[in-house]
Amino acid sequence: MAKKSSSRLPKRKGEYTYRGKTVSELQELSLEEFAELLPSRERRSIKRGFTDGQKKVLHEFKEGKKIRTHHRDMIILPEMIGIAIEVHNGKEFVNVELQPEMIGHRFGEFAPTRSRVNHGSAGVGATRSSKFVPLK
């Protein structure tokens, strides 16, 4: 009996591509040409232009400085691939290593703002039935 390959997990063959273009091809494109490959929301955001804060982040990136930012709405561009940045999640800065799969997404998608709550067990007297549970 032959083994079935898992159809849920996509097989990775070779280099990562975004809309049919490799990372090196994407890095050679101008910003306007790259914007045409993006989904409409990101494309419109880039065509409107970057904010002053986003321009500062791009400038720091080009100088090779360590990037710590509150600009969670900044779109990840192909030229940013391979660097580590720190994105603020509302409480602290979260380390994010930019990988090719992240192209076209925003910084904030990789720094979650909410953490899962782990409630403890209820105390004695918290419910009516727990009044009759003997203490240790």
UniProtKB/Swiss-Prot annotation:
| Gene name of this polypeptide | rps19
Q: What does this protein do?
A: Protein S19 forms a complex with S13 that binds strongly to the 16S ribosomal RNA.
The family database entries (SUPFAM superfamilies) matched by this protein are listed as: Ribosomal protein S19
Q: Does the keyword Ribosomal protein apply?
A: yes
Specify whether Acetylation is a keyword of the entry.
Answer: no
User: What domain of life does the native source organism fall in?
Assistant: Archaea
> Which GO molecular function entries does the Swiss-Prot or TrEMBL record give?
rRNA binding; structural constituent of ribosome
Per its UniProt record, what Gene3D superfamilies does this chain match? 30s Ribosomal Protein S19, Chain A (3.30.860.10)
Origin species, per record, is Methanosarcina mazei (strain ATCC BAA-159 / DSM 3647 / Goe1 / Go1 / JCM 11833 / OCM 88) (Methanosarcina frisia)
The name this protein carries in UniProt is: Small ribosomal subunit protein uS19
Q: Which keywords accompany this UniProt record? A: Ribonucleoprotein, Ribosomal protein, RNA-binding, rRNA-binding
TM helices/strands, residue ranges = none
